[in-house]
Amino acid sequence: QECSEIIREMDPTARTMRIITTCNGGEGTDWNVIQNWSGTYGGDVTKYGKELSQKNQLLNGEYGAWRSIDLHTEPGEFEANGVWSESRMCQLMETKIRLAEQAKDSVCGQFQWIFSSHDNPGRRQPDEAFRKIDKVGPFNYKGLVTPWEEPLDVYYMYRANYVPAAKDPMVYLV
């Protein structure tokens, strides 16, 4: 109720509001943002650009991919139910970047969830891991850097796509 009152005070023109809940049984609050997790929790990642272009989809406020710590696989076709490797994460995220850039005239923006993989107290992870080591925490492993702030392959992929080489050149060897 307190969050609803704050939102209403900040934007008295808002006719509808998103559901406001506590997260994972915790004491904090959260309100739902527009999300598109195609390729991560199901759905077809190749339709991401078309989904962003829909009239009711002006912004994607959350998208990402699971990964398994330091697990690498050989490149190949994207597999929707493939191994949650660093390589698959990069492939999924780069597909979303490419399709979002193609749809940029139809959408005001998108942002990736989340910069840093983080501890997620109260969250049970019985099925959200590929290997037992991924259940350490529990952590949300969708970040561009590890919980210890080590950049991942996907971090460098984003940097290569969004930081001009003329401004800040980089070489990344895998």
Regions found by a protein language model. Give the residues of each.
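Surface beta-strand/loop "capping" patches
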Residues: M157-V174
